[in-house]
Curated annotation (Swiss-Prot):
Glycans are attached at N164. Residues 33-52, 110-128, 204-234, 285-312 are cytoplasmic. Gustducin-coupled receptor implicated in the perception of bitter compounds in the oral cavity and the gastrointestinal tract. Signals through PLCB2 and the calcium-regulated cation channel TRPM5. GO terms for molecular function: bitter taste receptor activity; G protein-coupled receptor activity. This is Taste receptor type 2 member 9. The gene is TAS2R9. It is a multi-pass membrane protein.
Length: 312
């Protein structure tokens, strides 16, 4: 019988999982249907599909890890399953962060106007550049996740069962923990790329605004609006990542912290919020996805209205 804290944990994780799978699944479904209709796919659609799929995998593996931890506390920590979950988690987490950095770079190259030969060359080769980054992101994530497969969880912690379930941590956990922390620090690179993209977008916006003021036009042009939308999207991602990444690192080192099980439970709830909530920000920030989402809401509203029982 789960305790009150465990019951709250299960309810929150199940709710966030449902919302996250629905939001990211919606992104994949709408873009794939559009792909089949037009028999062509745009670069932004490829990025969003890749990002949404990685987020679905991340949501699922975080949830599975939490449920296994509660349901099989005495065997899960020493099983092969925990190694598989950890590898998939590492791959999905890193690929999600890298694909998001690809989205930020796409916004930068598509919208910003920077008078530098190298930047101009990148804009001309935007399709090849972004596809190369996407492929590189996939390979980097794969290499990092494979490097985790050395039975490190066996050295990370040992679960013992007493009268009440307790988590008994050993000194041998330290090498595995530090290795995982070191590998996961590599996920700071996508964050830095997003920060650079934000800085350059802001620089481009300031310069563009000055040009408008010199031309004495008293209204926002499409370029200014595009700059603002891109900057807002990158800022939101950076804010979410600032919350997500430290919590993820704490979870990675939870074996070194007292009450490690409680830390993992709180960490799961916080980390699953990032891929769940960001999907709806992406939907509302993309005209095609936003239109499809609003159309679906109108359909649901009409459907519920028709099913409403008649009251004389």
């Amino acid at each position: 019988m789960p305790s009150a804290i465990e019951a709250i944990y299960i309810i929150l994780i199940a709710g966030e999982l449902t919302i996250g799978i629905w939001g990211n699944g919606f992104i994949v479904l709408v873009n794939c249907i559009d792909w089949l209709k037009r028999r062509d796919v745009s670069l932004i659609d490829i990025i969003l599909i890749s990002l949404a799929i990685s987020r679905i995998c991340l949501l699922x593996v975080i949830s599975l890890d939490g449920f296994f931890m509660l349901l099989f506390p005495t065997t899960y920590g020493n099983s092969v399953l925990v190694s598989i979950v950890b590898i998939v988690w590492t791959f999905a987490n890193n690929s999600s962060l890298w694909f998001t950095s690809c989205l930020s770079i796409f916004y930068l190259l598509k919208i910003a106007n920077i008078s530098h030969p190298f930047f101009f060359w990148l804009k001309l080769k935007i399709n090849k550049v972004i596809l190369a980054i996407l492929l590189g992101s996939f390979l980097i994530s794969l290499v990092i996740s494979v490097x985790m497969n050395d039975d490190m969880w066996y050295h990370l912690f040992k679960v013992s069962h007493e009268e009440n379930i307790t988590w008994e941590f050993k000194v041998s956990k330290i090498p595995g923990t530090f290795k995982q922390l070191t590998l996961n620090l590599g996920a700071m690179v996508p964050f830095i790329l997003c920060l650079i993209s934000f800085s350059l977008l802001l620089f481009s916006l300031v310069r563009h605004t000055k040009q408008i003021q010199l031309x004495a036009t008293g209204f926002r042009d499409p370029s200014t609006e595009a700059h603002m939308r891109a900057i807002k999207a990158v800022i939101i991602f950076l804010l979410l990542l600032i919350v997500y990444y430290p919590v993820f690192l704490v979870m990675t080192s939870s074996a070194l912290i007292p009450q490690g099980k409680l830390v993992l439970m709180i960490g799961d709830i916080v980390t699953i919020t990032f891929p769940s909530s960001h999907s709806f920000i992406l939907i509302m920030g993309n005209s095609k996805l936003r239109e499809a989402f609003l159309k679906m809401l109108r359909f649901v509203k009409r459907f519920l209205r028709r099913r409403k029982p008649f009251v004389p």
